[in-house]
């Protein structure tokens, strides 16, 4: 089916169109996300980011100007990369929080807690 027709249906919140887009592009999106996350994330993390990509498409479908993008595939690829980068930022943030020195100020006392 033509991508333009799929996108028009998706804009009207046609669940069939979303299912068709998932069928067509889930392998492609999984490859993008795997490439960015396989060293840090688990299989479940990768699956979650892939799902988040399609959820984001669904939630923003009516606001997207599809003429701005060359194809549904390229638009989904952009969403997937952004979602994977968001995941990596959150992952790095968790790791940094665990390795940071924390300075607690209690009145006049300063206590330095070290996490190793």
Protein language model regions, located:
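N-terminal module of bacterial RNA polymerase sigma factors
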Residues: 1-24
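ATP/adenylate-binding site constellation spanning eukaryotic-like Ser/Thr protein kinases
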Residues: 26, 51, 81
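Conserved short alpha-helical segment within the catalytic ATP-binding HATPase_c
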Residues: 54, 58, 80-81
């Amino acid at each position: 089916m033509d991508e333009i027709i799929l996108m028009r249906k998706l804009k009207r919140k046609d669940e069939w169109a979303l299912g068709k887009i998932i069928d067509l592009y889930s392998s492609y999106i999984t490859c993008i996300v795997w490439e960015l996350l396989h060293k840090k994330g688990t299989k479940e993390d990768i699956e979650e980011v892939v799902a988040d990509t399609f959820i984001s498409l669904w939630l923003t479908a009516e606001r997207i100007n599809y003429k701005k993008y060359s194809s549904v595939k390229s638009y989904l690829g952009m969403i997937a990369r952004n979602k994977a980068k968001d995941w990596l930022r959150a992952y790095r943030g968790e790791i940094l929080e665990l390795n940071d020195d924390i300075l607690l100020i209690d009145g006049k006392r300063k206590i330095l807690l070290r996490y190793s």
